[in-house]
Amino acid sequence: MANTILTPITLWKDFDDTLPFNEEFLSKEEREGAVMRDVYILGRQTGFGRVKIYGRYYTPNGLESFPAVLIMFEAGFPCDEKLVMHFIRKGYGVLGIDYSGELGDGRHTIYPRDIDHANFARAGRAMDYVDETARETSWYEWTAVARYAARWLKERPEVTAAGAVGLRTGGEILWKIAPYAPIDCFISI
């Protein structure tokens, strides 16, 4: 099949990021002036189910409301606790999400089997090439995860404003969600 070039408008026009999150908090731990919670939220619907997005949500201890930051780390790398704690000390909440998917042991974003190419370790051609349309790439799925995560963070009742920080691959993803996501500002590093 010949490649089909899609503009950003046509690429995302049928995307539905309004489905309910059905969040599931898994654990709660207090440390260094923060409360850390592991959370799963549901993302986009595919033919084989919904993406189950894994994240860690940090909130500053003792604050009822605060601004928050979505952090998109480098693909395949774990959370940078030092960076997270920098924001916590400044009074921000932080949501660090996994978009890399299955990389080994531990909690991760779970992609339905029809979009297995979203798992960073198995992305293959879907990361570097567009064989049909951009919708069949890892980048599309990672961007979809970021759109859901940004909306979840912005809709939290305790969050007064939401920004985002992206590191390397995470920064590239932020450029892709900027026109669509409910974030007030972002920086790509």
Tell where the protein language model's regions lie, with residue ranges.
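Structural recognition of the beta-strand scaffold that forms the well-ordered cores
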Residues: 68-71, 94-97, 163, 185-188
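Primarily recognizes the serine-hydrolase "nucleophile elbow" in alpha/beta-hydrolase
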Residues: 147-189
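N-terminal cap/lid segment of alpha/beta-hydrolase-fold proteins
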Residues: 12-64
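Short beta->alpha connector loops
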Residues: 74-78, 168-170
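N-terminal low-complexity, Pro/Thr/Ser-rich intrinsically disordered segments
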Residues: 1-9
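Short beta-strand element of the alpha/beta-hydrolase
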Residues: 54-57, 64-74, 94
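Cap/lid segment of the alpha/beta-hydrolase catalytic domain
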Residues: 85-144
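A short acidic, amphipathic alpha-helical/loop segment
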Residues: 82-86, 176-177
